[in-house]
Amino acid sequence: MLTTIEVFSDFVCPFCYLAEQPLADAADGGDVQIAWRPFELRPDPTPTLRPEGDYLQSTWQQVVYPMAERLGVPIVLPRVSPQPYSRLAFEGFAYAEERALGQRYTERIFRAFFVKQRDIGKVEILTDVAGELGLDADDFRAALESGRYAEAHQQALRRARELEITVVPTVLVDGRRLEGVPSAEALHRLFDGAVAIG
């Protein structure tokens, strides 16, 4: 029986990026499907963070870099300042998801921001990523510029609020949740419980 893991995340959250590997490891070889779901930590007009600020500098030095090293995941604190809003990237996700490319789009957007330090709040950067995936770049750009997926994104955010998601990443399996970067062991326990219940 297929188990669906819902992962609520924000493209500008390093912990969401770091959760990718444990999730992939836990899903590997199992009857598991990962479904990424949007959550904006700082929706417009809330000010976004600046990488040169004390908060991000200390968080990355004390927590993010050590965790990334333990997980073997390359990551850098992007120099993009201020950090971008993620709304457009999530509207692009809705476009990709409709074409069965949501997982690959998510992976590419995380890497664009946390490895290549690209400004994922810009339509042209998102369009480049879409083109790399083989999506119709002109149609993708037009979709973002026209707001074609704005309502789909807002519906996804409403669902997150209904589920009382307040922390990312949050992993849901059959109504049970894990918050923060999950270990592979915790994920396996979560899956095993879901299979036993199902």
Regions found by a protein language model. Name each.
Residues 6:
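Hydrophobic "anchor" residues on beta-strands that sit immediately upstream
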Residues 9-12:
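Short pre-active-site segment immediately N-terminal to redox-active cysteine/selenocysteine motifs
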Residues 2-3, 15-32, 36, 55, ...:
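C-terminal cap of thioredoxin/glutaredoxin-like
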